[in-house]
Amino acid sequence: MVKRLVVTAGEPAGIGPDLVLALSKEHWPHQLVVCADKKMLAQRAEQLGINVTLLDYDASTAPSPQQAGTLVVEHIDMPSTCVAGQLNEENGHYVLKTLERAALGCMKSEFDAIVTGPVHKGVINRAGVAFSGHTEFFAELSNTPLVVMMLATEGLRVALVTTHIPLAYVSKAVTAERLLKIIDILHRDLVEKFAIAEPKIYVCGLNPHAGEDGCLGREEIETITPTLEKIRQEKGIHLLGPLPADTIFNEKYLNDADAVLGMYHDQVLPVLKYKGFGQSVNITLGLPFIRTSVDHGTALDLAGTGQADTGSFRTALQHAIELVEKKQ
């Protein structure tokens, strides 16, 4: 059965529109609906020398496979002009409107998944909206109390206990209650969305050497280890850890792990991006819909040049398609 996926172009001054337009160069097995300003897409296509027919989205028609040379567009009006590579805070609210339209469409079952292009957090905040990222935005919009940020590439999935918070706040944020909820969401989605019957989750410690028996920090002794043991006993989830972050990515562990759970953003993401930058995908777990995204930023210096690497965007779309098809 043909599905309908919605794609957001992200920050209009960045490479998001370039990545979206690149999708028009080939056939796709499902319908792709792009949430963006149609005029902006037409201008960027001309700048890039891409010959594409932009079709108006009609929700009343049945989805059909995406044909090369076309893009279906759900027009969201952009209030100010856009020049590739030049941020304009007057368009900050426009970016949020594209995200809102896509998410609400998924929540109404109009769309089967969201694939998001890169946004610029700074320009949205300068537009007067407190915005820390897609993950938190979609969680608030869908009234989801807690979501889990996962990134994946070939041979590695990593998830986070904390996401976009200052490093100084991480220790207090890693609580038994949060660990219980994060691991529950991670395990459930590995089973339900990734079709892994009995997931094996490897868990990082917080401190260097996972605390070195309390000599380098007591969070492992007081919080992480007892919480993992409680989950093992009560839920039977296969957990290994806490392990030192500088050894958990050893091949002997990764060959067995279905996911690695890190305590904070820069503990695990540098490893994943080194392993698969440009070929990795951001997946939000715990939402009432499927959402994937690129693993990189807006790359303003590449916008409109034709030099943007489409690898991560294609990977995000392919992962979304795989997850949608597993639901069938």
Swiss-Prot record:
InterPro entries: PdxA, PdxA_fam
GO terms under cellular component: cytoplasm
Keywords: Cobalt, Cytoplasm, Magnesium, Metal-binding, NAD, NADP, Oxidoreductase, Pyridoxine biosynthesis, Zinc
Cofactor: record remark: Binds 1 divalent metal cation per subunit. Can use ions such as Zn(2+), Mg(2+) or Co(2+).
Pfam assignment, any one: PdxA
Signal peptide coordinates: none
Catalysed transformations (reactions): 4-(phosphooxy)-L-threonine + NAD(+) = 3-amino-2-oxopropyl phosphate + CO2 + NADH
Cell compartments where the protein resides: Cytoplasm
Binding-site positions, substrate: H134, T135, K273, N282, R291
GO molecular function, one term: 4-hydroxythreonine-4-phosphate dehydrogenase activity
Amino-acid positions noted as binding a divalent metal cation in the UniProt annotation, renumbered to this chain: H164, H209, H265
GO biological process: pyridoxal phosphate biosynthetic process; pyridoxine biosynthetic process
Keyword rRNA processing listed: no
Pathway assigned to this chain's UniProt record: Cofactor biosynthesis; pyridoxine 5'-phosphate biosynthesis; pyridoxine 5'-phosphate from D-erythrose 4-phosphate: step 4/5
Major site of localization recorded for this protein: cytoplasm
EC nos: 1.1.1.262
Cofactor(s) the protein needs: Zn(2+); Mg(2+); Co(2+)
Additional notes on this entry: The active site is located at the dimer interface.
Family annotation (NCBIfam families): pdxA
The protein's role, per its UniProt record: Catalyzes the NAD(P)-dependent oxidation of 4-(phosphooxy)-L-threonine (HTP) into 2-amino-3-oxo-4-(phosphooxy)butyric acid which spontaneously decarboxylates to form 3-amino-2-oxopropyl phosphate (AHAP).
Subunit structure and binding partners: Homodimer.
UniProt similarity note: Belongs to the PdxA family.
Annotated protein name in UniProt: 4-hydroxythreonine-4-phosphate dehydrogenase
Record organism: Vibrio vulnificus (strain CMCP6)
Gene: pdxA
